[in-house]
């Protein structure tokens, strides 16, 4: 037959420790836990093979292509310190393996098949290096941080949001009423909960109309530009686009999408529409913990965050560091920088395995949301800085005097923290003091401070 039939070890072809990575390669760092008795080189090579050109046996059609040009290569393996039988396997993929401008294809190749592999007990994709040559094939966020600030005319501080609760069960008119109260009180944005789509108790069109009325009314009263994230997520792409188009016709500034449950293909279509039609796009990461929570299997959220920046979104939820959902500070700040900055140096202490150059792809605003309230404001201002959206759902609507006073309390706390920071005070040390001082002249804030003074989500 002219080729040697049979099964041969992956590492003979796909483990190449002397390979020099190219500037155009897509690089991946996998955390590999091999089955007992499987050498790490073989496990790493198996991942490289099965996520690129390889299959389990030699096939005669291998002779019709240049494997050297197209194969993924495992070029380095290191043990994970402090973990038994875990290794980081670095794999380089030639650029030509991937369709341009398709996060869907990127993920299908790199994580599509290998995670059920028998030779591995567990596998986790920790990071991806996206080369500029591939970055340039994506539109990325519809607008980005600077354009968003210019559209909203809001500078020098984080933006404030609030998710309308109870998330399911309100009628459209009462929902709009809650939106109006929050925006009038001083928030920049209110938000549809991620699971509010178009249910029997509140159809999407009714909600869109009442929310638009609420935000225009609040805008007229406060003289500030307001937004409500209208969730366009739907059961079909066509229906999603229909909702986005209706939002644009209402003249609202921003829509929202659940990018993991909706899928990358739908998300990228929506992002293109948003750029073409001047809509901002807020992204919720519902379902991320299914993929990213296990430490040894799945995908780290920083990979999902990079994927979103390519697919497109102007805001994305990124954990809080301080609220009810988990996230370590340095690691969170690592992927927050990956979302916002143009160029991020490799830094293993923050979980960043590769230097990432986004060239001119716009940045994404990280959203801190989940169990946060006024006492967290100094820490949030300190940790996230100006380019972020701080979202207080219960922390606004749970105010004893109602939504508008809840919004006032948050806005006063934020302005006090920003002012204190600008005066050179150390928010990490003096934060509580800053909030207490502000509460002296804001009864709304004083009431909020009283309600949440003891709340901690420590487990």
UniProtKB/Swiss-Prot annotation:
The active site is at 165 (proton acceptor), 284 (proton acceptor). The modification N6-carboxylysine is found at residue 191. The keyword Disulfide bond applies. Its EC number is 4.1.1.39. The modification N6,N6,N6-trimethyllysine is found at residue 4. Binds 1 Mg(2+) ion per subunit. It catalyses: 2 (2R)-3-phosphoglycerate + 2 H(+) = D-ribulose 1,5-bisphosphate + CO2 + H2O; D-ribulose 1,5-bisphosphate + O2 = 2-phosphoglycolate + (2R)-3-phosphoglycerate + 2 H(+). The record marks 324 as: Transition state stabilizer. GO terms for molecular function: magnesium ion binding; monooxygenase activity; ribulose-bisphosphate carboxylase activity. It is an enzyme of class 4 (lyase). The basic functional RuBisCO is composed of a large chain homodimer in a 'head-to-tail' conformation. In form I RuBisCO this homodimer is arranged in a barrel-like tetramer with the small subunits forming a tetrameric 'cap' on each end of the 'barrel'. One of its GO terms (cellular component) is chloroplast. Mg(2+) binds at residues 191, 193-194. RuBisCO catalyzes two reactions: the carboxylation of D-ribulose 1,5-bisphosphate, the primary event in carbon dioxide fixation, as well as the oxidative fragmentation of the pentose substrate in the photorespiration process. Both reactions occur simultaneously and in competition at the same active site. It comes from Geum quellyon (Chilean avens). Belongs to the RuBisCO large chain family. Type I subfamily. This is Ribulose bisphosphate carboxylase large chain. Keywords: Calvin cycle, Carbon dioxide fixation, Chloroplast, Disulfide bond, Lyase, Magnesium, Metal-binding, Methylation, Monooxygenase, Oxidoreductase, Photorespiration, Photosynthesis, Plastid. It is found in: Plastid, Chloroplast. InterPro entries: RuBisCO, RuBisCo_large_chain_AS, RuBisCO_lsu_C, RuBisCO_lsu_C_sf, RuBisCO_lsu_fd_N, RuBisCO_lsu_N_sf, RuBisCO_lsuI. Its cofactor is Mg(2+). Transmembrane segments: none annotated. SUPFAM superfamilies: RuBisCo, C-terminal domain, RuBisCO, large subunit, small (N-terminal) domain. NCBIfam families: PRK04208.1.
